[in-house]
Amino acid sequence: LEYCGYLKELYGFELNKEDVKNRRYSISRHFLDHVVELKPQAELIIQALKKQEIPLALTTTTSLFNVQRYQDNNQNINAKISFDDDFALILTRENVQNIKPHPEIYLNVLEHFKIEAKDCLIIEDSLIGVEAANNAGIEVVAIYDQYSAHEIELIKARANYFVQDFTELLRHIA
């Protein structure tokens, strides 16, 4: 609520802190339910890896609440994938003490699947995600993301591999 008060003061909103908070959450819910989309061809990567019987984990610094909103309400996403069917493991910020770039979330994946880092490959779209994979000692494929474009050179330098999109990655794994 203090943050909403800060926004009110910073931007001169005529709304009170509570109204700013309500408006913020309304916009956020709309974004989660209707705007967020999978990266193009992501579902094809998921299908290809599942066809090869490779267990998949979804690891995210977002909240479980947001993941559930994507799954339950976002037709852009749930028309293409099923979180429950497509991922053997889903870990969110609530499952770890330390979020990315700390390696904890990826170390938990290794432990869950009882595998070594050399038997795992991470697909990431952010610098902190690439750093988390590096910190866990796991090879990482970075994929271009418009929201990480300002860090693209660092991402390319720290990732083991870089692809522009999932179509490019699909050519290597199919």
Region locations from a protein language model:
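Proline-rich intrinsically disordered, low-complexity coils
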Residues: 40, 55, 101-103
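Asp-based, Mg2+/Mn2+-dependent phosphohydrolase catalytic module
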Residues: 47-50, 63-174
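N-terminal helical cap/lid subdomain that shapes the substrate entry/recognition surface
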Residues: 1-52, 68
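Short, surface-exposed alpha-helical recognition segments that flank or form part
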Residues: 33-37, 58, 100
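A structural preference for short, pocket-lining loop segments at secondary-structure junctions
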Residues: 54-56, 60
